Structure formats: structure tokens, C-alpha cells
């Protein structure tokens, strides 16, 4: 804690802030390891770019729809629960990819929708928790350090994954990478179990301009 307090100018760095950084770091590394290579893995199975287009269309369609649902749940239930739902969906996605293996191309829309739902729940909750857990004095530190983690993961992940896939024959490299990502998701699951967010104050509106008057 003392090291982080020096970085923030002797401001108090609480446990939840560090846990949120860990969760974000694990997420960034997992995404950087897998994002490009999931598409390549699916393309190698079908050889048709239209299938990849359908897969990614399912991802980007479900993500904003999930944002709306996640916003309602975050207000009415709990932001931590929404975060857990997101992490759980991402875990199920990678476990499913590992289980179906060479038959993954048969479930493109299901996999894409599952990933989009995971992204939607995760990012809504993460952004809300970032605002709630950090204080004005520690927010710059959080955003800066999170940027370092994200950038580092973005540089290391694709290189490491590419090396592993090219070093192992056949689909073994992809299986190894996806298994590593599944383990990173497990680490996120473990970290978020210890996360405690303060009770929300005020109201969360997905479309503030449509707020009714009292």
C-alpha cells in the first residue's frame, strides 16, 4: 500500500481500488491474448469471412442491448452482481470454445452473443465501480495506472499468443492460449469476490433526456 500511496501523493489507496485494478489488468491481458486469435481460429475452421462477419455482428449487437439491461440491474440490484455476470459470461464463452473445439464454427452466433453479453455486463459495471470506488484524489492515479496495465497487456498479449500458437502444431497452440485466458478469467472471478462497492447514491439513467419529471 505504501508504494501506491507514494504514487498518488500520499493519498489513501483502499483495497477495493487495487482489486479493481487487478480485475482490469486480468481482463486486458485476457482480451489481448485472445481477441485476434479467436477470429483466426474460427476463420481457419470455415475459411469464409462472412462467418466472421456474422460472429462479430452478434458481438456488437448484443453489447449495447446488454448495456441497457445492465444499467437497470446496476441501479435496482447491485453493481457487483452485474460485474460478476459479465465475468461469468466471459468465462462461459472461453470454456465453451475449449469444449466445442473444432465445432466452434457451428455455434458462431451463440458464441458471438455470449461474448457481447459478457462485454456489456462487464464494462457497464466496471465503469460505474470506477467512479464509485475512486475519489477525486485517486482517480488520476487509477486511470493512469489502468492505462499502463492496458497498454502493457496490449503489447505483450498478442506477441506471446502468436509465439505460442506458432510454436505448437495444429490447434494445440489455440487450445493453450484459450486455456490461459480461461485461467485469467478465473483470477478475475477470484478477485471480484473480495470487491465491496459502496451503496449507490442518486439515480442511474441510461437515457437521461427521457427522464420523467416528478
From Swiss-Prot:
It is found in: Cell membrane. It is a multi-pass membrane protein. It comes from the Bacteria. The keyword Ribosomal protein does not apply. Coiled coil: none annotated. GO terms for molecular function: transmembrane transporter activity. Keywords: Cell membrane, Membrane, Transmembrane, Transmembrane helix. The keyword Transit peptide does not apply. PANTHER family: INTEGRAL MEMBRANE TRANSPORT PROTEIN-RELATED, MAJOR FACILITATOR SUPERFAMILY (MFS) PROFILE DOMAIN-CONTAINING PROTEIN. The chain crosses the membrane at residues 18-38, 51-71, 80-100, 108-128, 145-165. SUPFAM superfamilies: MFS general substrate transporter. GO terms for cellular component: plasma membrane. This is Uncharacterized protein in sodM 3'region.
